[in-house]
């Protein structure tokens, strides 16, 4: 017989209500032993919870959900009693005296829901993300993922890939006409539509991953431009040593902050210049390592040393070396000394913010700009939440689509195109759990709460 599992569904500690959840074929047996009666599905019962000798341990609401009409898809019993931890522990101990009942693993209720097709893997992950959300925007986005918005987009992509794959494989079955099929433009048109569709989902997923995991913001610039002062201003504390000596920061400094609940990882780096000191050279190389992995770069410029219009010329080598997909915000610091007014403007394709890290004038403008860059919205609108593994799967799918496009347009190789489309389908299906290893499932659900 399949295991019946039990766990506390409410947080450990003192509260108004405490809930124990039981799922599995023995759920009704628990009701008979602890409550003294079988329960009708979906009907709330106010009953005493009894020990083996009939002693009343607590009293409260009991709810029974008959399979498959429950969260896990199994028979489920919920006992809602008083929220004292001692009471809940006594009741849990009582339930575990019943043969065939064991404590649930972390995330096992959600895992059973996934295995019983009550929700897919992306939706299951969204449960944990909703619980862990640190902002209203992240919570709303996690809820959209739980309701299937992300999964629906993936399923639409998979359906499009299957349709095209079927069309291509049908052409392969008629070798005399295969070239005509592959060259008539219809397959390439469908393939281009899938590529555009996938790129749109990738863009949304990247924004969703930033909402969940935080945006990595690297502060870069020349020595003494005020990078460490800006880190301190954003952190709201003296996280970095600040002096007038150029090159004070020689290693990477990291600070984790929240802006209206939105997580950011702020990284202060060594000043970029030609250095003769070996230690400083190492610091500069580490700075570049961080820059190349950034989600956003803040380029600090001393407003007392050059005009705003000159930055593209002065920083041409830096901009050329920077990966093209990383957004850059130019920060003109020390406006308290240069006499410039605080403000934000668009200049030559870059956002430029004038501020003083020392006096904190204009720092709020930067905070609002970073929130916007992360996808913050004060309304109820917004996208779904995503994880890094989702981004990796989407990236893998995009790579196979690109290879498939080459096989089609350059070689008219139907069999190789069909194989690339199969790989695309597998990569996308990993997101929803249609093709997923047991090891991956274990890693995902082990990060959940006990009782979920």
From Swiss-Prot:
Chain positions recorded as K(+) binding sites: 224, 243, 245, 248
InterPro entries from the UniProt entry: G_TrmE, GTP-bd, GTP-bd_TrmE_N, GTPase_MnmE, MnmE_dom2, MnmE_helical, P-loop_NTPase, Small_GTP-bd
Broad EC category: hydrolase
One biological process term in Gene Ontology: tRNA methylation
Cofactor binding comment, as recorded: Binds 1 potassium ion per subunit.
GO molecular function: GTP binding; GTPase activity; metal ion binding
Keywords: Cytoplasm, GTP-binding, Hydrolase, Magnesium, Metal-binding, Nucleotide-binding, Potassium, tRNA processing
Superkingdom of origin organism: Bacteria
Annotated residues for binding of Mg(2+): 228, 249
Subcellular location: Cytoplasm
Positions contributing to GTP binding: 224-229, 243-249, 268-271
Domain TrmE-type G residues, every copy: 214-375
Cofactor(s) listed: K(+)
SUPFAM superfamilies cross-referenced by the UniProt entry: P-loop containing nucleoside triphosphate hydrolases, TrmE connector domain
GO cellular component: cytosol
Pfam families: MMR_HSR1 (PF01926), MnmE_helical (PF12631), TrmE_N (PF10396)
HAMAP family with a match to the protein in the record: GTPase_MnmE (MF_00379)
UniProt-listed NCBIfam families: mnmE_trmE_thdF, PRK05291.1-3, small_GTP
Subunit (UniProt): Homodimer. Heterotetramer of two MnmE and two MnmG subunits.
Role according to the record: Exhibits a very high intrinsic GTPase hydrolysis rate. Involved in the addition of a carboxymethylaminomethyl (cmnm) group at the wobble position (U34) of certain tRNAs, forming tRNA-cmnm(5)s(2)U34.
Protein name: tRNA modification GTPase MnmE
Organism name: Actinobacillus pleuropneumoniae serotype 3 (strain JL03)
């Amino acid at each position: 017989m399949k295991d019946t599992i039990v766990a506390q569904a409410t947080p450990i500690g003192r509260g108004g209500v405490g809930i124990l959840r039981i799922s599995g074929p023995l759920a009704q047996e628990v009701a008979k032993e602890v409550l003294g009666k079988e329960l009708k599905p979906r009907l709330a019962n106010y009953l005493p919870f009894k020990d083996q000798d009939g002693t009343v341990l607590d009293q409260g609401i009991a709810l029974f959900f008959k399979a498959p009409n429950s969260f896990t898809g199994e028979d489920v019993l919920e006992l809602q009693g008083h929220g004292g931890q001692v009471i809940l522990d006594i009741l849990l101990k009582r339930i575990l005296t019943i043969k065939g009942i064991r404590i649930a693993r972390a995330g096992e209720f959600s895992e059973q829901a996934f295995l019983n097709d009550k929700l897919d893997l992306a939706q299951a992950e969204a449960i944990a993300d909703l619980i862990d959300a640190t902002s209203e925007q992240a919570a709303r986005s996690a809820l959209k993922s739980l309701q299937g918005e992300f999964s629906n987009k993936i399923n639409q992509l998979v359906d499009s890939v299957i349709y095209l794959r079927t069309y291509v494989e049908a052409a392969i079955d008629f070798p005399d006409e295969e070239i005509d099929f592959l060259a008539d433009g219809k397959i390439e048109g469908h393939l281009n539509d899938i590529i555009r569709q996938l790129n749109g989902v990738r863009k949304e997923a990247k924004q969703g991953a930033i909402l969940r995991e935080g945006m990595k913001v690297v502060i870069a610039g020349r020595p003494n431009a005020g990078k460490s002062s800006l880190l301190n201003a954003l952190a709201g504390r003296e996280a970095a040593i600040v002096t007038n000596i150029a090159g004070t920061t020689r290693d990477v400094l990291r600070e984790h902050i929240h802006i209206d609940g939105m997580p950011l990882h702020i990284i202060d780096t060594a000043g970029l210049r030609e250095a003769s000191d070996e230690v400083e050279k190492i610091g500069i190389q580490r700075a570049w390592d961080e820059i190349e992995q950034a989600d956003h770069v803040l380029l600090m410029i001393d407003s007392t040393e050059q005009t705003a219009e000159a930055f593209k010329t002065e920083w041409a080598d830096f901009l050329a070396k920077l990966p093209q997909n990383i957004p850059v915000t130019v920060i003109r610091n020390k406006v308290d000394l240069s006499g410039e007014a605080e403000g934000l403007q668009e200049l030559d394709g870059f956002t430029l913010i004038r501020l003083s890290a020392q006096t904190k004038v204009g720092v709020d403008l930067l905070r609002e700009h970073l929130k916007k860059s992360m996808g913050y919205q004060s309304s109820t609108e917004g996208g779904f939440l995503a994880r890094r593994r989702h981004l990796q799967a989407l990236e893998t799918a995009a790579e196979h689509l690109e290879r498939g496009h080459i096989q089609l347009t350059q070689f008219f190789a139907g069999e190789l195109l069909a194989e690339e489309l199969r790989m695309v389908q597998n990569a996308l299906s990993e997101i929803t759990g249609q093709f997923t290893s047991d090891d991956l499932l274990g890693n995902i659900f082990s990060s959940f709460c006990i009782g979920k």
